Design a protein with these regions (language model features):
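Surface-exposed, charge/polar-rich loops and edge strands
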Residues: 1-413
Length: 413
């Protein structure tokens, strides 16, 4: 069985798709005004804002009350036939981004038995960054009694040959179009097509072949190859996994092979899609002795012929060569050094997206900045396979408004 499968997808039958679709709950956590606008915009209409708990509300006194209300609203939407069921289907999605490019994806479900978020996992589906396990229990409280799930998870495949999703895109005119509208709050256009029957079967066959050949792609690496990586929403998928494991623990010996909790709805995307841009995240260390830090880095983590990165101290800058033997990625070498150094020496690290902002911050007294290169797309899977996990803040996949909006759903009870 493939690790990514067609699902009985719940598709909303509502008058306003614009009011229905809401951005991922882990965005705009420090901007309550954003969520207030969303609630006001969707007031009185069926909307996913009534089915999710914005992350900003986790751990607040209102959490339990809001969670109970969410579950009641989910049950109400099901009872009132808000959804049309798309049996044994995928949904092909095209999302316009800020720069005008179109990101392609395929909504389906993953087998949680094929996913393990722990560091050093050898499962077919893995996390790209370290999972903060303390963040899972609050999310389990939201999911545990929910009758349906709505995904904001973006899962990635390393399909350089573009054999999985792209053939669906080429034949989309033969598919039933489900939606075409503008997402609220500047999310731009989104379109979706139903992929079922022969089109779904053809995708399943291509995925079977793709999975069988994954080992050849990474034959030069010591680690066990993987099929998919979780790009966005890993803590959401980890929550689904934890709820499933909890169910298994409470029902020893029960056959849960076809239980809805074994699966989770996600959107699969190809890292080699032209719209996928991996932006680097730079490092600045303040409240430190910058020259001492730089000297320690040269002594402990540098080697000739390594990854070249540029450092900035005040108005001075230069290049250093990081030891390739320590990681598949330059950021892996640097972050490993910084983690160890800051345990024994003074300094505070921050993660900066903009080049100019990093240089300006490094001009402060007692500061040093490191400008990192953008990660090549082919390095993502190789980095996880070889190193077990990517360093935190390795790369950024798009801006906040480009994250997935809640749209499709699936029964989990």
């Amino acid at each position: 069985m493939n690790a990514f499968l067609p699902a009985d997808i719940l598709f909303p039958q509502v008058d306003s798709m614009e009011k229905w679709a809401v951005i991922a709950c882990d965005q705009f956590t420090s901007d309550p005004a954003y969520w207030e606008r969303v609630r006001k915009n969707a007031e009185g209409a069926p909307s996913t804002i009534n089915l999710i708990l914005p992350e900003a509300e986790l751990g607040t006194p209102q959490e339990a009350e809001h969670t109970a209300l969410i579950n009641r609203t989910m049950a109400e939407y099901l009872k009132n036939n808000i959804f049309r069921t798309l049996p044994d289907s995928f949904v092909y999605v095209e999302r316009t981004l800020d720069n005008g490019t179109v990101r392609k994806g395929l909504v389906g479900m993953v087998d949680l038995d094929a996913y393990d978020y722990s560091v050093g996992s050898t499962s077919a589906i893995r996390a790209t960054e370290r999972t903060v396990v303390e963040r899972i229990p609050p999310r389990m409280r939201v999911r545990r009694d929910a009758p349906i799930e709505l995904p904001h998870i973006l899962m990635l495949c390393d399909d350089h040959e573009k054999c999985l999703i792209e053939p669906i895109a080429a034949g989309k005119d033969k598919l039933e179009k489900l939606y075409d509208f503008e997402l609220m709050e500047g999310g731009h256009n989104i379109k979706g097509w139903l992929v079922d029957g022969e089109a779904a079967a053809a995708f399943n066959a291509r995925l079977t072949d793709y999975t069988a050949n994954v080992g050849k792609k990474y034959a030069d690496l010591k680690g066990v190859p993987m099929v998919f990586a979780v790009g966005d929403g890993n803590h959401s998928l980890a929550t689904a996994k934890s709820c499933y494991e909890e169910l298994k623990a409470k029902n020893p010996g029960a056959d849960l092979s076809n239980h809805s909790a074994r699966f989770a709805l996600v959107e699969l995307e190809n890292i080699h899609d032209e719209a996928q841009v991996f932006e680097p995240i730079h490092r600045v260390i303040t409240k430190c002795d910058p020259w001492a830090l730089l000297e320690a880095l040269k002594n402990e983590a540098c080697a000739e012929g390594g990854y070249e990165i540029r450092w900035y101290i005040g108005e001075e800058s230069g290049l250093i060569s990081l030891d390739r033997s320590k990681s598949q990625l330059a950021v892996g070498v640097l972050q490993g050094f910084l983690d160890a150094y800051l345990k024994r020496s003074e300094g505070e690290i921050d993660y900066i997206h903009d080049d100019d902002a990093l240089i300006a911050l490094a001009e402060q007294e007692n500061a040093i900045g490191f400008l990192l290169p953008a990660m090549e797309k082919s390095q993502l899977f190789r980095g996880v396979i070889a190193d077990g996990i990517l360093p935190r803040k390795t790369f950024s996949m798009g801006h906040s408004r480009e994250k997935r909006y809640y749209l499709e759903a699936r029964k989990i009870k």
